[in-house]
Regions:
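A ligand-binding cleft/hinge motif common to bilobed small-molecule-binding domains
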Residues: 93-107, 175-176, 200-201, 205-225
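Bilobed "Venus flytrap"/periplasmic-binding protein-like clamshell domains
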Residues: 34, 40-63, 74, 115, ...
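C-terminal motif of bacterial Sec signal peptides marking the signal peptidase cleavage site
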Residues: 17-20
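An extracytoplasmic/periplasmic, membrane-proximal ligand-sensing/linker region
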Residues: 32-41, 45-65, 244, 248-302
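Short beta-strand->loop
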Residues: 108-130, 185, 218-236
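Bacterial signal peptide processing site
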Residues: 22-24
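Extracytoplasmic small-molecule ligand-binding "clamshell" domains
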Residues: 30-100, 105
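Acidic, polar ligand-binding/catalytic clefts
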Residues: 82-150
Length: 302
């Protein structure tokens, strides 16, 4: 009996020690201070084009923060979440869906969400700055597709499964009208511009893009609005985030946040950010801003 009591006391002591260590680790786990800031993007356009466009941002950030900055273009959103988890990336320009996945795993915290000019239902850019956007389903005008239910049996061009506007919101919208993943033929395409080109070439019947990705192709495809139509637009989606790895120190969160805010306020900086993602500015964000995204994720995952 005494041996059992001794073992029990020893076990309880061990649990208390480990618990104390865990609390100690947690207390000191948010103290990362980068010596070189690693920033990562996922392309919403041609990745080769984006690689060239991010270099000026690298220089601006380095100047603002006073340390070397290395910018990298990720292959997809899943790779970016993994890079945050493995602490290979400090700052991520990450979609709302990928942010919620990363945050729920404890590997990312949101700093800012982007602002952009509102695009109306005709594809015209207004002068109203908003912190949301929408996803849309686009088809060619010469086909028989007029509403979501018509997509049963169609070949649909979608983005990465963690893309907010290119996968999650359109798939959730389809499920709401009883069109399941098994009811469509999915063609995974990298880049919203490439999806629209595939549609114009007749490689797919419909594509999901952000509203209104067609505007980005008007110069190369002047008839894109004449030849295509949006048959559906989703509810509001919170804009893309600038997030940091989960163990970033509070001081550096503030520094990074202020650096991006300052860059976005200058004409030179605004042009750089517009060229990369169409961002017109930023505002501070909190995790609860993205609860609606979690609801759409859950609907797709069910």
């Amino acid at each position: 009996m005494k041996k059992l009591q001794v073992l029990l006391i020893s076990f309880i002591a061990l649990v208390l020690i480990l618990s104390g260590c865990s609390k100690h680790d947690k207390k000191h786990s948010r103290d990362h201070e980068p010596k070189e800031l690693k920033v990562e993007f996922v392309p919403s356009q041609n990745s080769k084009t984006l690689n060239a466009k991010v270099k000026p941002l690298q220089q601006q950030l380095s100047k603002e923060l006073g340390l070397p900055v290395k910018v990298h273009v990720a292959t997809n959103y899943n790779a970016m979440v993994e890079a945050l988890r493995s602490k290979k990336v400090d700052v991520a320009f990450i979609s709302p869906v990928s942010y919620t996945i990363a945050h729920d795993k404890g590997v990312a915290d949101v700093l800012l969400k982007s602002k952009g000019y509102l695009v109306d239902d005709k594809g015209n850019t207004t002068n109203k700055l908003v912190d949301y956007y929408r996803s849309q389903i686009v088809v060619r005008k010469d086909n028989h597709l007029h509403k979501l239910k018509d997509l049963k049996g169609a070949k649909v061009g979608l983005q990465d499964p963690e893309s907010t506007s290119g996968y999650i919101y359109p798939m959730a919208s389809l499920k709401k009208v009883n069109v399941n993943q098994s009811d469509i033929k999915i063609a995974q395409i990298k880049g919203h511009d490439q999806a629209l080109i595939a549609l114009l070439n007749g490689d797919v019947d419909a594509v999901a893009t952000y509203q209104d990705a067609r505007a980005d192709l008007k110069q190369d495809y002047p008839k894109i609005y004449k030849d295509t139509k949006a048959i559906y637009r989703t509810d509001k989606i919170p804009n893309d985030t600038i997030s940091v790895r989960g163990d970033m120190s509070k001081q550096w969160k503030t520094k990074i946040s202020n650096a991006f805010l300052d860059i976005s306020k200058s004409e030179k900086g605004k042009k750089i950010l517009t060229d990369i993602y169409g961002h017109q500015g930023y505002e501070k964000a909190k995790d609860s801003d993205f609860d609606t995204v979690r609801k759409y994720r859950k609907l797709v995952e069910e």
